Every structure is written in C-alpha cells, then in structure tokens.
Swiss-Prot record:
PANTHER family, sorted: GDP-MANNOSE MANNOSYL HYDROLASE (PTHR43046), MUTT_NUDIX FAMILY PROTEIN (PTHR43046:SF14)
GO MF: dCTP diphosphatase activity; dTTP diphosphatase activity; dUTP diphosphatase activity; hydrolase activity, acting on acid anhydrides, in phosphorus-containing anhydrides; magnesium ion binding
Nudix hydrolase domain ranges (all copies): 1-141
Enzyme type, top EC level: hydrolase
Protein name: Nucleoside triphosphatase NudI
Family: Belongs to the Nudix hydrolase family. NudI subfamily.
Subunit record text: Monomer.
Function: Catalyzes the hydrolysis of nucleoside triphosphates, with a preference for pyrimidine deoxynucleoside triphosphates (dUTP, dTTP and dCTP).
Gene: nudI
InterPro entries: Nucleoside_triphosphatase_NudI (IPR023781), Nudix_hydrolase (IPR020476), NUDIX_hydrolase-like_dom_sf (IPR015797), NUDIX_hydrolase_CS (IPR020084), NUDIX_hydrolase_dom (IPR000086)
UniProt-listed PROSITE patterns: NUDIX, NUDIX_BOX
Pfam families the UniProt entry points to: NUDIX (PF00293)
Keywords assigned by UniProt, alphabetized: Hydrolase, Magnesium
EC number(s) per entry: 3.6.1.9, 3.6.1.12, 3.6.1.-, 3.6.1.23
Length: 141
C-alpha cells in the first residue's frame, strides 16, 4: 500500500473558514465538502508543499498572513481517479491553522465550488469524515 503525506490548510478569514466541494468524479471524498490539501512531493519541504497546494488548488490571489502547524492524523483511504481507477492509500494528514488577508479564491478542477463558512453554519454542509473530525477537534462542530 502506498503512503502519502498530505498537507491541509484550515484557512480562516474574519471568522469564516474556507471549505471546498470536491469534484464528483475524483479524489478521496467525491462530491463532499472538505478543507483543501494535497500531497508532499519527493524532496519538497512541508511548508513549501502547503504553499504550492494552496496556489494550485485555490489560486495565486489568496494571501495567507499566518501559517501555524496545528495537528496531524492518519487513515487508510480509497482514492478515485478521474479515469475511474481506485487505489487504497495510507494517508498522514498534517493540518495547519492559516489566516488569510482576503477571500480571493480561484478553485482548480479538483473542486466544483467553495464557500467561506461561519462556525455556526458548518453543520449544514455535507462534510467528509476527515474534515468533520478536524473541525470537531478544533471545537468548531
């Protein structure tokens, strides 16, 4: 089984948290709401990977003013690829508290939508199990 280290920014701006709705045809949690994130590439430092993933998934315009390592978790997940292939992967999630100076987001093809969500409204979203666990640990659910 392949192992991946995943960096995940829990991004907050003015009391709201950034959630992204996964594409229906790919990823570990197709069609569900999640915090963004992605894999660390060979030879890449953790913070470099985090900043790269944010640029790739959320656009160059989103300006982070704070990045603080927060917690980690792990799990075995089944990833679905755009071509329909599936793969079981052992994932180690490194989660960061982040603050953004703006809300300028341009999502890539991995997502179909995004929203800035106040903590009291998080219960109204179909959150994937990993995001739900993270938000509970943070005291937001």
């Amino acid at each position: 089984m392949r192992q991946r280290t995943i960096v995940c920014p829990l991004i907050q701006n003015d009391g709201a948290y950034l959630l992204c709705k996964m594409a229906d045809d790919r990823g570990v949690f197709p069609g569900q709401w999640a915090i963004s994130g992605g894999g660390v590439e060979p030879g890449e430092r953790i913070e470099e990977a985090l900043r790269r993933e944010i640029r790739e998934e959320l656009g160059e315009q989103l300006l982070l003013t704070e990045i603080t390592p927060w917690t980690f978790s792990d799990d075995i997940r089944t990833k679905t690829y755009a071509d329909g292939r599936k793969e079981e992967i052992y994932m180690i999630y490194l989660i960061f508290d982040c603050v953004s100076a703006n809300r300028e987001v341009k999502i890539n093809e991995e997502f179909q939508d995004y929203a800035w969500v106040k903590p009291e409204d998080l219960v109204h979203y179909d959150l994937n199990v990993a995001t739900r666990k993270t938000l509970r640990l943070k005291g937001l659910l």
